[in-house]
Design a protein with these regions (language model features):
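Ser/Thr-rich, low-complexity intrinsically disordered terminal regions
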Residues: 1-138
Length: 138
């Protein structure tokens, strides 16, 4: 049988080597923290229904895991965002899309999952939304 999780995801073979790694998003010049926060929260809530941590003062957002079930596997994904202070007084954020995979037979308990170095295609839009709604560089 085809590896559905592999086919439904992107990895370094497609130049998307972002799973389980922090990458930076720098906000457009002049963007306020308020606007950035609203846009980040919007991306988090739209793509991951359950936001577990939303601490505006600390500039930290963390979603709950979202499970995606395939015939033989379960992939779970979550988003974490932390404000990052750069020397140039630029507003930027560290973003991590965590991805883990389990055999469906094992179930959904934490010990069934291991890190998965691919991001499900349905979360590709999260990466582009971060770029377009906040800033440019990665």
């Amino acid at each position: 049988s085809a590896d559905e999780a592999f086919n439904g995801s992107m990895g370094s073979d497609e130049g998307v080597d972002l799973a389980n790694k922090f990458f930076s998003v720098t906000c457009k010049k002049g963007m306020t923290e308020d606007i950035a926060w609203k846009r980040l929260m919007n991306i988090a809530v739209t793509n991951f229904e359950n936001v577990e941590v939303r601490d505006k003062a600390a500039g930290w957002i963390k979603t709950g895991w979202v499970n995606t079930t395939f015939t033989y596997q379960i992939v779970r994904t979550r988003l974490e965002i932390q404000v990052q202070f750069t020397e140039e007084n630029e507003l930027s954020y560290r973003v991590k899309i965590s991805s883990e995979i389990a055999d469906k037979d094992c179930g959904t308990s934490n010990q069934c999952f291991s890190k998965y170095d691919r991001i499900l295609r349905k979360y590709e839009s999260v990466i582009s939304e971060l770029q377009t709604s906040l800033g440019s560089n990665f």
